[in-house]
From Swiss-Prot:
GO terms for molecular function: rRNA binding; structural constituent of ribosome. It comes from Xanthomonas campestris pv. campestris (strain ATCC 33913 / DSM 3586 / NCPPB 528 / LMG 568 / P 25). Part of the 50S ribosomal subunit. Contacts protein L20. GO terms for cellular component: cytoplasm; ribonucleoprotein complex; ribosome. GO terms for biological process: translation. This protein binds to 23S rRNA in the presence of protein L20. This is Large ribosomal subunit protein bL21. It holds the Pfam family Ribosomal_L21p. It comes from the Bacteria.
């Protein structure tokens, strides 16, 4: 069984047992978190699809928090001897999907 969930403004296709990185969540490592905004559920019988499936949820365990690799930004003005360098490291939360519960379409 798989599901499409929404967190941090992004959509993720997940299955039980998978580990993935999502935008930073304010939950301590080792705690459980429940995602209620599920857009799609799928299994061998077919799919359930909708804006938000009523009663559907995905539970996950927070494995760790961290920061992604550095992205380097360079702004350059030609012929003006001007260059600006900047770096950014995005915070993320690594989660492990522990369960997917089905629901009815809203």
């Amino acid at each position: 069984m798989y599901a499409v969930l929404v967190t941090g403004g992004k959509q993720y296709r997940v299955a039980q047992g998978e580990t993935l990185r999502v935008e930073k969540l304010e939950v301590e490592a080792g705690n459980e978190i429940k995602f209620d905004t599920i857009l799609m559920l799928g299994d061998s019988d077919g799919i359930k699809l909708g804006d938000a499936l009523k009663g559907a949820s995905v539970t996950a365990k927070v494995v760790a928090h961290g920061r992604a690799d550095k992205v380097r930004i360079i702004k350059f003005r030609r012929r003006k001897h001007h260059m600006k360098r900047q770096g950014h490291r995005q915070y993320y939360t690594e989660i492990e999907i522990t369960g997917i519960a089905g629901g009815d379409k809203k």
